[in-house]
Amino acid sequence: MKQKFVLPITPPSTAEKKPQTENRCNENLKPRRLLPQLKKSVRNRKPRLSYRPELNSVFDLDAYVDSTHLSKSQRHHMDRDAGFISYALNYSKRMVVVSGAGISVAAGIPDFRSSEGIFSTVNGGSGKDLFDYNRVYGDESMSLKFNQLMVSLFRLSKNCQPTKFHEMLNEFARDGRLLRLYTQNIDGLDTQLPHLSTNVPLAKPIPSTVQLHGSIKHMECNKCLNIKPFDPELFKCDDKFDSRTEIIPSCPQCEEYETVRKMAGLRSTGVGKLRPRVILYNEVHPEGDFIGEIANNDLKKRIDCLIIVGTSLKIPGVKNICRQFAAKVHANRGIVLYLNTSMPPKNVLDSLKFVDLVVLGDCQHVTSLL
């Protein structure tokens, strides 16, 4: 008969026993830190939206901020719309912002299409011609004007600081509430901020900010595609002779490769030309497919707020992105705000379909509603 071995129910005497009175609480649990976190969680909990204006309602932001000329009844009526904006800014959890040049005007950088914008200062042609690829690189005089504009914008933006609106977006991104900023701006004020940084060239992981039209902060070779910080000293801006500058400067990296190939007895492959890394009309967007992929992925998220700000949406591709996001946000019972200094054209609002509130005035004032 085989003897069965039974393991002892109690551990052997050599096992270390802990006293029953020992405190077994999680050592990482710090009650004094936990309580403020719980309070913050309760405070940030999204309350129920009690008021929604009719679609395409208009709110005069400047008049509301400077309410000295408003009657008591007018102020009371506008308080509801102001509360609606405040709700969107304070409680939205997954926001998409599509911005234009209007958000940088307060920093000292002019916009493009207003009565005092960049396009209005162009002599001998339309302002749009300065951003047309065929005109800029098909006519020497237009190339000079384009260089003047790019160098001027670069130096101006270098001496400007992000605005209160930029700072507000940076805070949204810091708090994890900004899904994406799609910016049409080339001044780079937004990407100076730590939580609105981007990748140049655009690459994964997808950054907080997607630059739809490039940036004046960089230049690129059309041949080797080498990207460098923009150097204004390379670009000729007038008719005066200067051996250090060219209207369309040659790429130093390509020239170096050519020198090496020549010394090695290899045939020439040509030297590329440098240009500001700004996307122009009538050229293929080098990152267009990737931006479309990012937008399509963002559309799959549960976006609860779309803010269109500082843009007239004249560019069809940008208007189409806004239209798709507006439909998605509306389906999610979110909020769509359109902030601009002037009333958007009816055809733009009809295309977007689901704008809850058109906020007229200086977008910097909206930060007072936080």
UniProtKB/Swiss-Prot annotation:
One of its GO terms (molecular function) is histone deacetylase activity, NAD-dependent. The active site is at residue 213. Residues 1-27 are annotated as: Disordered. Residues 75-370 form the Deacetylase sirtuin-type domain. Its EC number is 2.3.1.286. Binds 1 zinc ion per subunit. Keywords: Metal-binding, NAD, Nucleus, Repressor, Transcription, Transcription regulation, Transferase, Zinc. It comes from the Eukaryota. One of its GO terms (cellular component) is mitochondrion. It holds the Pfam family SIR2. Zn(2+) binds at residues 221, 224, 251, 254. Its main location: nucleus. Its cofactor is Zn(2+). It is found in: Nucleus. Residues 15-27 have a biased composition (Basic and acidic residues). This is NAD-dependent histone deacetylase HST4. It comes from Saccharomyces cerevisiae (strain ATCC 204508 / S288c).
